[in-house]
Amino acid sequence: MLRDLKQTDNVGGFDVRPGNFLLNGATTVSGGVNFTIHSVYAVECTLLLFRPYAKIPYARLRFPDSYKIGNTYSMLVFGLDEVDFEYAYSF
């Protein structure tokens, strides 16, 4: 279960692990937020985190290559609360 998962890596100062590829978009889970995105042509993907209404991201988390299956990237970022950030992706 997602609530029993532990971090396996640190990306951009955040504890992370491969996400649940079946949860599309940003999904709050116990302990953090799962981010999953599908892109046919992307060769890499970076998660951008913003403070609410900010124009410049406060964090950039590049998805490790091992967090990609086919054309889908998924990463669980621990310690995030959905009310504290906005997000985007960079390809």
Question: What residue ranges belong to the model's regions?
Answer:
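Aromatic-rich carbohydrate-binding modules that target alpha-glucans
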Residues: 8, 16-20, 26-27, 40-83
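Structural beta-strand segments of beta-rich domains
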Residues: 31-35
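Short beta-strand segments enriched for Tyr within beta-sheet-rich domains
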Residues: 37, 83-91
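A eukaryote-biased signal for short, well-structured alpha-helical docking elements
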Residues: 1-9
